[in-house]
Amino acid sequence: RDVLGSRGLGDVYKRQDIDLNTLRLNSRDTMRNVPDEKRYGYFKGLDRSSGEGQVGYFAGCMTLLTPRTISAMEKVFQAAGEEVWWADREGGVCCGRPLKLAGETDSARKMMRYNTELFRKHGITTLVTSCPICLKVFREDYALEGVEVLHHSEYILRLMKAGRLHVGHGSTRYTYHDPCELGRGSGIYDDPRAVIGAVGELLEPAETRENAPCCGSSVANTAISDGQQVQIAKSVAGQLEATGAEVIVTACPLCKKAIGRGTKGEVRDLAEIVVANIR
């Protein structure tokens, strides 16, 4: 699509029917101009001001679909006494990767430039995200000199080690699903496990770390049907439930939603179980 577009043939792939996926992805570019109260209308009772601070939080479009994760992160920041600037509440919507994968390179670059300017404007030195996809893109595709990019599992563990976030160790049995983008994509395996171990008992599934199965969902997945995705999610959930854990934990909004479709059990983001054990 990118090559066709650069040669003035951008409509070739749209001649047979309407490309709804491309239209949907491009809407992320225009979402920067959507009033905050409309984009965040489902955050009942949350402070929607963007705030200030050297730490910035970027939820991203996937995490916006799991508002409990965002709510939990807000409580983590509050408990640690962290002053935070909320990027998404000032127009930062998407890291740009979905647009890039769809061949909409110009729109992706526009989105990346916008986000970069937003980060520089606020002078943040640490950027925290709950989305492994955003994490990888910010680290590899953005020029963010002087800004440390952290996944929220890394950030939460750092707060715990620094004595800024105090949690209690309970008897709840947890199991953890390694997100593809966080584990195989960014090599982050130990931090989420250390956080879980601080609040309860961790039970590992049969396939874990580098060998952990994909949840079945992807921002660029067009190869399998929705029904097939659900079947994969059920298989993954079944393996996790076989550990005897009471709660399935993951650290990716896409994985959380996908696995949730495959089980009637409890599926939580890492930040949620931390908040439940803050002392």
Locations of regions flagged by a protein language model:
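Single conserved hydrophobic/aromatic residue that forms the stacking wall/gate
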Residues: D2-Y13
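Membrane-anchoring hydrophobic helices of lipid-metabolizing enzymes
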Residues: R15-D47
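Aromatic- and Gly/Pro-rich donor/ligand-binding loops
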Residues: D36, S50-S71
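A short, charged/proline- and glycine-enriched loop
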Residues: S49-V55, G168-Y174
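Conserved beta-strand elements of the Class I
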Residues: G56-Y57, T175, E246-V249
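Cofactor-cradling patches in redox/metallo enzymes
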Residues: C61-H151, E181-R279
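Catalytic cores of enzyme domains
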Residues: H152-Y155, K161, T172-G185
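Short, surface-exposed amphipathic charged segments that create phosphate/polyanion-binding patches used
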Residues: K161-T172, S217-A223
